[in-house]
Structures are given as C-alpha cells and as structure tokens.
UniProtKB/Swiss-Prot annotation:
MF terms (GO), sorted A to Z: xylan 1,4-beta-xylosidase activity
Organism: Thermoanaerobacterium saccharolyticum (strain DSM 8691 / JW/SL-YS485)
Name under which the protein is recorded: Beta-xylosidase
Family: Belongs to the glycosyl hydrolase 39 family.
One GO BP annotation of this record: xylan catabolic process
InterPro entries: GH39_as, GH39_cat, Glyco_hydro_39, Glycoside_hydrolase_SF, Glycosyl_Hydrolase_39
The protein's enzyme class: hydrolase
Active site location: 160 (proton donor), 277 (nucleophile)
Keywords from the named record: Carbohydrate metabolism, Glycosidase, Hydrolase, Polysaccharide degradation, Xylan degradation
Gene3D superfamilies: Glycosidases, Glycosyl hydrolase domain, family 39
Domain of life according to the entry: Bacteria
EC nos: 3.2.1.37
C-alpha cells in the first residue's frame, strides 16, 4: 500500500504547456474529410492551441510552380490548397506552428527524398529563388490573415537536419546557410514574426550549441530553439511492424533538461525552447503507440515536461498519416492519439484526463499529480506504467486529499488493459485490417474509459481515497461539491422500489 498525504496549500502552478501544440501528418492530408473530422474531435476534447506538420512546400500542397514564358522560367506561387488547409485550422480554433520544408522538386538541387510521399531533402539549387519563395509565402499569409494573427505563428526552419534522411549529408554548414537566408527573408517581410530551429532529433545536441553560436557570430535572427525527443532504441524490423525497447520516461525528461541548460549557457539564455515532436517510438509502425502502456508512460511526461520546456508537441494527433505508406490496417503502430475511423486510443484519454486538471498543483510524484481548480474542486491523476513482464504489477494507494467542502461527489475514469483499450478488442476480433462498420462501432464503444461515481463525507477537511491500479492503468478522480436536494422530494423513499 502506497500512502500519500496531499498538503492543503501549494504555491506551485501546474503548467499547461503540454497542450500548446500537437503534431500532424503532412499538411496535404488536411484536405481529407477524416483528417478534419478527427482534428475537430481532438480540439474539442483536448484543446491544443497549435498544430505542426511537414510538407508546407512539398509538391502535393502545390505552392511552388514554374511557368515557361518564351525562353524564361518564371516561378508561380499557388496558394489554393494551403489557404484551404490553414483556413480549416483557424476555423477549428487551432493555429499553425509553421515548419518550413521540404524542398519543392522544381527548386531542388538533387533528387534525394524521404517518406512514401517523397519530401525532397536537398538544398535549393538557387538560393535567390528560395528566398523569394519564402518572402512570397509569408507575405501571402499576412495578406490573408493579417500580421496580428501571423505574428502569433512560430516559423521553424526545416526538420531534423542532423539526419542524412532529412537533409542531404546532414551537412551542418549547409543547414546554417539555409537557416540564415530563410530567417532573414522572413524578418524582411515582418520583423515581428518568430523564427527558430534547428529542429534536430536526439543524439546530436552539439548542433544546438553550434546553431546558437552561429546565430550569435553571424547576427542571424533566432527567437526560439526547437528539438525532438523519442525514447526508443534500435528496433527489430518486420515487413509491416517494428518492435523497439522503450527507455524509462526520465530519459526524455533528462533530454529536456539538458537542452534547457545548453540554452541557458549560450549567448541567448532566455530563448523559448519548444519540443516540436515527441513520443515513445520514432516509428509509425510500432504497436506500442496503440497500447495502454503508451498512455501510462506519457502521463509522467505531461506531468513534468512543462518544468523544462515552453511547449512539447505530441507526434501526432491522428493515424491519418502516410510516412511509410497508406496505413495497411486499423491498428498498425501509428503515432496518432486517434486511430483510423476515429477510434480514440488510450493515450488520447491520458491527454483528455490532463485537460481536467487545475492550475494549483498540490502534490506530484513520479506516478501521481493532484491539482485544485479555481472553483475549489480537486483533480487527481495516477498511472502505473509497467516496463517489464512482472507477475505482480498492481499498485494500491491510500491518498488523503484536502477538500474544501463537507459533502463530496466522486467521479472516477479509468483506462487500463481491460478498460478503454480498443487495441485489445481489435486483437480479440482477429486483427481485422479493414473492419466492418459494426466492428468500428464496437471499437469506438470499447475505447471509452470505465466511469464510476460515488459520494463521501470529508473528515476534518480531508477525504481518504483508496484505489488500486492494474497494469498500465491511468485513472482520473474528480472531487466536486455535492449539493444534496433529496429533502425537497416529498415522500421520497427509495426502499419502496423493488430490490432497493
């Protein structure tokens, strides 16, 4: 039995930086109905403020085109699709966190590409045309949405240039050239627009030191630092899936701390620091993303990550995603909070649970957080991620919680291996690749958490709450004031109902 006594007062605030931004598949996917329907659903339930994805300048979005006029090739900037995409985002109430990339094929210096949809990762063959493209894009955004709006959008330059897969030869010097020209082009359009980078993945934090030194020495604009974070090791690949060992959650939190310290010790100690991608695995084919384990694992990141970064963006909100190809089955290890056919995964509910938290943080440890809301109600989240195949994974708790009212209504929501686990039900179904409408409805029904309610009376201002967490459980308790109006019902007597 784990016993916890929650103090009645705290001067600590719980940050909501975990919902500042969420990731998405390439922007061209936003032209699909299921994508937009899912984004609306996620926004309504979790209320992310920004959305970030690849592909702004890729050919499927169609911004950069060229016309042949006589003997001359003239650029043509086509904003038909990006207007439709960004209009949709803003109508839903979510702003773009703009990633500048990848290279339009007509402007590329080579043919190297990444992903099924062939994002070109080579430098521009003509940096002047690139500069003009950037100015045209930013100018169009300002013309359409106004500078007051666009000034709220961070502009991140490229994606993981420290990897050869994402930037030709992982050439740091060439990336710095691209960054300098791009950042200055954006600032020439309007100096109030925020620019940053280098958007690297883990294992290359020296890039951040080099990047900040470069910006200082070359007087290059930089308004924020960005990085990605994943905790999976090298994997075992199959034709359809990848299996990887996941390192403990403190590994990711330590990465957050390390980069924050690098920034503090740089020439720009006060720069905002954004984690623009994070998850357990970096592969969209790892089944871990579909599991209750992922939900329990991510809980600690949501609880503590805001201590070290200005935002951290879960990768991604939906399995409408095509890096490795069009998804081949209902569950396939996709990154999304929501699976195909709008089936919420367990991790979706971890985020939704955190959306219920208050600002005053009364208590926090590695497996629990307790907050008080403005109205005096209390919200508690606890989790039990199980990293190995232990025989006795359950944890029992007794928590004394300060509650500012005598009579308490208790609402409990729970996900674990047996509750709110559509992946498990899909396995019971026989793993149908393309489930029928009936099967999809069953998966949606199963995806909901178990909900239980009760009421209790406090003792000297405290409520004693006992509960058990099974393997990979995440639980949300909400304690609100109970107003009993039973005395207003004349002749009320439930004992006269058969069986009561």
């Amino acid at each position: 039995m784990i016993k916890v006594i929650v103090p009645d007062f705290s001067d600590k605030k719980f940050s909501d930086r975990w919902r500042y931004c969420v990731g998405t598949g390439r922007l061209g996917l936003a032209l699909q109905k299921e994508y937009i329907d899912t984004l609306k659903y996620v926004k309504e339930n979790i209320d992310f403020k920004y959305i970030r994805g690849h592909g702004l300048l890729c050919d499927d979005v169609g911004i950069y085109r060229e016309d042949v006029v006589g003997d001359e090739i003239k650029p043509f900037y086509n904003f038909t699709y990006i207007d439709r995409i960004f209009d949709s985002f803003l109508e839903i109430g979510i702003r773009p966190f703009v990633e500048i990339g990848f290279m339009p094929k007509r402007l590329a210096s080579g043919t190297q590409a990444v992903f099924y949809w062939e994002g070109n990762v080579t430098p521009p063959k003509d940096y002047k045309k690139w500069e003009n493209l950037i100015k045209a894009v930013v100018s169009h955004f300002i013309s359409r949405y106004g500078i007051d709006e666009v000034a709220k959008w961070p502009f991140e330059i490229w994606n993981e240039p420290n990897l050869k897969e994402f930037w030709k030869d992982a050439d740091e010097k060439e990336y710095f050239k691209l960054y300098k020209i791009t950042a200055k082009a954006i600032k020439e359009v309007n100096e109030n627009i925020k620019v940053g980078g280098p958007a690297i993945c883990g294992g290359a934090d020296y890039w951040i030191e080099d990047f900040l030194n470069f910006c200082y020495e070359e007087n290059v604009p930089v308004d924020f630092v960005s990085r990605h974070a994943y905790t999976s090791k090298q994997g075992e690949y199959t034709p359809h899936l990848i299996y990887q060992e996941i390192m403990p959650s403190e590994y990711m939190l330590n990465e957050f701390k390390t980069v924050r310290d690098i920034i503090k010790n740089s020439h720009f100690p006060n720069l905002p620091f954004h984690i623009t991608e994070y998850n357990t695995s970096y592969s969209p084919q790892n089944p871990v993303h579909d599991t209750p384990f992922n939900a329990a694992y991510i809980a600690r990141i949501l609880s503590e990550g805001g201590d070290y970064v200005d935002s951290f963006s879960y990768w991604t909100f939906s399995d409408v995603f095509e890096e490795r190809d069009v998804p081949r089955s209902q569950f396939h290890g996709g990154f999304g909070l929501v699976a195909l056919n709008m089936v919420p995964k367990p991790t979706f509910y971890t985020f939704k649970f955190f959306n219920a938290m208050g600002e005053e943080m009364l208590y926090r440890d590695e497996h629990m957080i307790v907050t008080r809301r403005d109205d005096g109600s209390v919200a508690l989240i606890a989790w039990n991620e199980v990293m190995d195949k232990t025989e006795n994974p359950d944890k029992e708790y007794e928590v004394q919680i300060p509650v500012g009212f005598k009579d308490v209504f208790i609402k409990r929501q729970l996900i674990d291996e047996e509750h709110g686990n559509p992946w498990g039900t899909w396995i019971h179904m026989g793993r149908p690749r393309y489930p029928s409408k009936k099967e999809i409805n069953t998966l949606r029904e199963i995806a909901k958490p178990e909900i239980m309610t009760s009421h209790a009376v406090t003792n000297d201002g405290y409520l004693n709450l006992k509960f058990k967490l099974a393997k990979n459980a995440v639980v949300l308790y909400e304690l609100t004031e109970r107003i009993d109006e039973s005395s207003t019902y004349i002749g009320l007597d439930d004992s006269k109902i058969n069986g009561y």
